[in-house]
Amino acid sequence: MNQQVIIFDTTLRDGEQALQASLCVNEKLQIALALERMGVDIMEVGFPVSSPGDFESVQTIAKQIKNSRVCALARCVEKDIDVAAEALKVADAFRIHVFLATSDLHIESKLKKTFENVMEMATQSIKRARRYTDDVEFSCEDAGRTPIDNLCRIVENAIKAGATTINIPDTVGYTTPYQFGGIITNLIERVPNIDKAIISVHCHDDLGMSVANSITAVQSGARQIEGTINGLGERAGNCSLEEVIMAIKVRQQMLGVYTNINHQEIYRTSQLVSQLCNMPIPANKAIVGSNAFSHSSGIHQDGVLKNRETYEIMTPESIGLKEIQLNLTSRSGRAAVKHRMEEMGYQDKDYDLGSLYEAFLRLADKKGQVFDYDLEALAFINLQQQEPEFFHLDNFNIQSGSNVMATAAVCLVCGKELKSEAATGNGPVDAVYQAISRITEYPIELVSYQLSGKGQGKNALGQVNIVVECFGRRFHGMGLETDIVESSAKAMVHALNCVWRTEQVKKEKQRIQQNTKEMV
């Protein structure tokens, strides 16, 4: 009888560490809801003690998610565990994930402790976490380089203390599949109480073997896989969940295991994470890359036309990838747009129909016909920009040419006031940014600028993703228009609104603290 493999997603914790700018609470919630629809069993959504922002994100997601178990990370430190429990207590069901380094290198160089000290710290921390929940995971950080005798000892000890899931991370992506599978086999054969816990694996991709290591671990007896959407993560990233999930589905007969994932949601979730995290998906990325189901060789094309199974081991439809269609124009009504979104798998709560339809009409007037990829791009932008705006781009005008300094005049709505400025720059985009900076008077530094095309032909959309630094923090902005300069301007305005909201939160916290002091 096939056994279930639990899917543990850590996109919002481990995956976020790879981003140039942190996600805001609303963006994290959108990803969490998508993961819930996809059917992940556990989602690790943050490290609450690390910052007030992470605490707020974990708490917000814990309130909203009903069909997946929400998890938060904590070091083997009392405060970490208590803060994690406080953030999670609003959830219907939650897990606390405590971790501690177990390799000689980490214990001696980083922790400056002995292995016996580490054993005691793990025991006390697991027991403390069990005060709050009966679902506690313990991770042996750098397990891949931990002597097997020590690993067996601390795993047995952790289970005795109350850990219900034992996670074996290949923290630096060092092991090979044969070696990693052997570690799991050793634990199953040598730890007497191993049957009282689920063995989990968390593989990094430094040598490009994270998915292979995870699959080999499952063949050896592991029953939980940890990873991220699109393989996001520090350095070379984590185990790519869409890859490992589809490997289990396609090779289910050989592996003898299954997952509870809704495979039809894989592509859409991957696209959402890519857009919100400003991390483009390589064209040749397995499962979700734009070339994953394309065939250019004449021999391959002939085979696919005769029988798709000749060169396709899975179908695009199996991951929710629909054929691109051309069916909407400026004459299409709101109901038609809503119907098309439903056909693509979107639910009402995934987007705001009013703002989406307004953006659709503007685009349809420019392009004439709107494709599915256009509509999805607009939906993603609306998801990211649906929070109240303080700054709004009213209009702009540019003058540029060869051997001429670019000049831009920009009008911004700032609250209820219309402000305008002009500036020169090294090209039209830089000139627009200089003018916007003069209006807002924010000390903004452009860290990253990326331009990508959405669609085909002369009316393709230009998507601009930027990262700016302001007041010591980084913020992400996104713009989408047929005009690249306008798209660039809207990306900057989007980032500025993120800055403004952050500053408002800071001022409100200061006001509350001041009132508290006065009351005392």
Curated annotation (Swiss-Prot):
Recorded catalytic activity of this chain's protein: 3-methyl-2-oxobutanoate + acetyl-CoA + H2O = (2S)-2-isopropylmalate + CoA + H(+)
Keywords recorded for this protein, A-Z: Amino-acid biosynthesis, Branched-chain amino acid biosynthesis, Cytoplasm, Leucine biosynthesis, Manganese, Metal-binding, Transferase
GO MF, one example: manganese ion binding
Location of the region described as Regulatory domain in the Swiss-Prot/TrEMBL record: 392-520
Highest taxon listed in the record's lineage: Bacteria
CDD domains found in the cross-reference section: DRE_TIM_IPMS
Cofactor: Mn(2+)
Alphabetized PROSITE patterns for the sequence: AIPM_HOMOCIT_SYNTH_1 (PS00815), AIPM_HOMOCIT_SYNTH_2 (PS00816), PYR_CT (PS50991)
Cellular component, GO annotation: cytosol
Subunit structure: Homodimer.
Function per UniProt: Catalyzes the condensation of the acetyl group of acetyl-CoA with 3-methyl-2-oxobutanoate (2-ketoisovalerate) to form 3-carboxy-3-hydroxy-4-methylpentanoate (2-isopropylmalate).
Protein name: 2-isopropylmalate synthase
Organism: Photorhabdus laumondii subsp. laumondii (strain DSM 15139 / CIP 105565 / TT01)
Gene transcribed to yield this protein: leuA
